[in-house]
Every structure is written in structure tokens, then in C-alpha cells.
């Protein structure tokens, strides 16, 4: 296990990478959300993670799990609508699994706790056309890759990203069952879910950061999200 300083550095690097990616993808996420939502998902996600990244200096002396917890707190305060408590509250809840350090085992526990809290708060299941459609296959794949297939974390995370990509693709042909999109009923069919898409973007940046800090290598011809990008 890497020392605390290295783990903190990796968490902060991941935060900055995620914030930059969501800023880059703001318009695309807005376009997706304009079709089936309030057209604010891109702005909300950019604002929340950018505010968290701006607090980097405040996090410099914290343990990694405390950094993650404080990111969650910042998201609750700065991400509008229901997304703030959904993302931020779930991150805060799951951060306790990282107390004592970030390892393959604790990262699995974090992912499972995060997924469970997202499902509990949002009431969504697979097939609801939400971020859960990306999270469930990603978390299950990551857990299996670590615990059953005995893969190194970097390879396991790469497989989880691929699983999330398939989950995002799955949201397009199904009807929304939760959130504002559900009010559209069958008119929501044919549109990719923005929450699942931003989840994939976040996971891609976690993988990119992990490649800088973990031993090993993964083959990626392109970002997984390139395969799900749609012109709305």
C-alpha cells in the first residue's frame, strides 16, 4: 500500500482531473439533459467538482478518506437540485470505507457503499435510466475482478470503465422510470441518460489518474466515452 502522502496526492490529482473533464464536457452533458431533463446537469457537475478542486490547499494535511469526505460535503453545498445530496451524500457515506488507507479491498468496499447509498437515496434500479445503469455493472465488474479474478486494481478499474460504457449505451433505448425524464414517459426513449454519462466521465478520469500512480498497464485505443457520444 502506498504511503499516506502518495495516496492523498493521487486523490487530489483525481479530483482535479475529474473537475477538468466535467468542465470540458459541460456543453455535451447540457445537451443530453436538455432532451430529457432540466438542462442543468452539465453546469451543476462542473460547478460542484470545480469548487471541490479549488479547495485543494485545504486538503493538503488531511488523510485520504478525509479528503474524499470533504469533497462530498462540497458537492452537497454546490451541486444544485437533487444531484447534490445524491452525489455528495453518497461520497461522504462511502468515504468511511477508506479510513485506514486505500487498498484494493477498501476501494471495493467504497464502490459498493457508494452504489448502495445512491440506490437508497435515489430509489433507482438497473433499468430506471439513471446513473445506476452505469454504476451497477461497473461496481460488480470491479468487485469480481478484484475478489474472484485476482486482477490488479488498474486492470480491474479498466474493466469497470468498459462495463460502465455498456451501461451508458443501455440507457438510450429504454424508458425513464425515475427523475424528471420519467415525466416524458415513452418520449424519453432514444435519449442517452446524462447522469450515467457523467458517471462514465468520472470513472475514465479515475482510471487515467490510477495509471499514473499504480504499477501495470492497460491497453486503451480511445476513451470509452467516445463509443457512447451522441449528437442530440
Q: Could you say what each language-model-derived stretch is?
A:
Residues 1-232:
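N-terminal loops that bind phosphate or other acidic moieties
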Amino acid at each position: 500500500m502506498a504511503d499516506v502522502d502518495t495516496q492523498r496526492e493521487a486523490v487530489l490529482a483525481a479530483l482535479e482531473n475529474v473537475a477538468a473533464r466535467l468542465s470540458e464536457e459541460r456543453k455535451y452533458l447540457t445537451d443530453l439533459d436538455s432532451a430529457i431533463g432540466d438542462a442543468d446537469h452539465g453546469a451543476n457537475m462542473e460547478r460542484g467538482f470545480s469548487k471541490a478542486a479549488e479547495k485543494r490547499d485545504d486538503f493538503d494535511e488531511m488523510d485520504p478518506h478525509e479528503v474524499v469526505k470533504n469533497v462530498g460535503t462540497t458537492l452537497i453545498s454546490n451541486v444544485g437540485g437533487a444531484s447534490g445530496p445524491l452525489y455528495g451524500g453518497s461520497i461522504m457515506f462511502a468515504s468511511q470505507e477508506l479510513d485506514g488507507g486505500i487498498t484494493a479491498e477498501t476501494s471495493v468496499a467504497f464502490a459498493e457503499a457508494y452504489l448502495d447509498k445512491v440506490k437508497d437515496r435515489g430509489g433507482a434500479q438497473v433499468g430506471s435510466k439513471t446513473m445506476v445503469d452505469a454504476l451497477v455493472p461497473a461496481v460488480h465488474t470491479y468487485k469480481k475482478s478484484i475478489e474472484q479474478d485476482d486482477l490488479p486494481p488498474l486492470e480491474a478499474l479498466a474493466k469497470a470503465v468498459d462495463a460502465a460504457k455498456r451501461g451508458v449505451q443501455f440507457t438510450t433505448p429504454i424508458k425513464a422510470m425515475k427523475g424528471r425524464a420519467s415525466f416524458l414517459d415513452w418520449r424519453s426513449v432514444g435519449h442517452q441518460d446524462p447522469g450515467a454519462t457523467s458517471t462514465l466521465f468520472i470513472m475514465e478520469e479515475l482510471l487515467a489518474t490510477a495509471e499514473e500512480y499504480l504499477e501495470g498497464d492497460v491497453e486503451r485505443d480511445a476513451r470509452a466515452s467516445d463509443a457512447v457520444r451522441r449528437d442530440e
